[in-house]
């Protein structure tokens, strides 16, 4: 147990200067006894926590060899199960390594988190195990989950199973989760999405899954609470619906769920309902400045499949979609700098679960290993801190106000149609850089693909992504966006598309494995 030493005179002076209190030295000295008494309460709280914190379970885990981990997608492997029965009985699941598993080390793709072993299981893990799933391991993710590419994870990139030379990116930040499902190493996985981190690798690796409505599922290990989402990654819409059924619902620990009344829904049963007929193609989701025209063509061809299935398909313009990324960018940058970096992951001023040991571990390791953070995280830290200091919070406040306008524009279209449709990404998976590249190119490869995905993190709409086709021998994703808290209906529309196209293609090296499942 640590002790909290009262500040000395130099530290008192620094605190005074930080807040511009203008206290003279004699006045500062008057505050010293009162401050010491205040600090005593913090020490008392620490003693109580240490007395009540549970001991982590004794769970075995293994660091796989290179031969066992050809895609560099596993952080550690395990075999944890609770029951032989349940809707996920017999299914193996990979957990993104930003989700806590008691007694199993986690890294979150970063040297700053490396060495931490949590005492607690995340709610989503407990629900999966209670449903009969077997946890097969922790999947590698990007450094603090802040990259849409798969090149920032420590110690090496996650590789795309569609390329037999393993020279292409898997997408991020849930890079390992997607690669493991696509390659047949596991049946399903859990990922996180704050700017597209589930949907980007879905499109790159050619599987299906979703970012549900914000707050539908309890989150863990936050970046910025208002954009954090967890979601399922699977090979079929049916499996995604089954996972969503298991994982959805409040747990009393996640403040993201405080404003939502979440009733239990059987998303798998919803697939038996008649599909809606109104689909709208969002013009601004196509022909972006970085768009590959062949990707647009593949998505348009997939939309024709929807039309041939007797669905009404129309085209609409939502101009504010072009500005929505900028709104997300301010919130994600300032919010992550405040909560994830300065706030040592959790920040303050909200209810819910906190892990004091993780906070102090992150705080100490950030000071020791901050130089090893990815360039994307460094950009977020510097940019977010600068705009917050120079603007006094006005930029984040303005972005928060604009969220309402962006959400209202999507809701207006969704009031007349069942779902919105656009490409998930502007291009297919790209090659992993083989040498150090200029900063501008590095940031472009890590973040340029999220122009369509990020807006729906900030508005909270559910977004599901089936495979639309292939370009250059690599998968293309199509994003189908539904009404908030109407995830079951959105899943249904994606299932209608999946039924029309049949089975999705699989990576060459996974074909034999998946054929036996």
From Swiss-Prot:
UniProtKB keywords: Hydrolase
Reactions it catalyzes: a monocarboxylic acid amide + H2O = a monocarboxylate + NH4(+)
Induction profile: By aromatic and aliphatic amides.
PROSITE patterns: AMIDASES
GO molecular function: amidase activity
Subunit structure: Homooctamer.
Annotated protein name in UniProt: Enantioselective amidase
Gene source species: Rhodococcus rhodochrous
Gene behind this protein: amdA
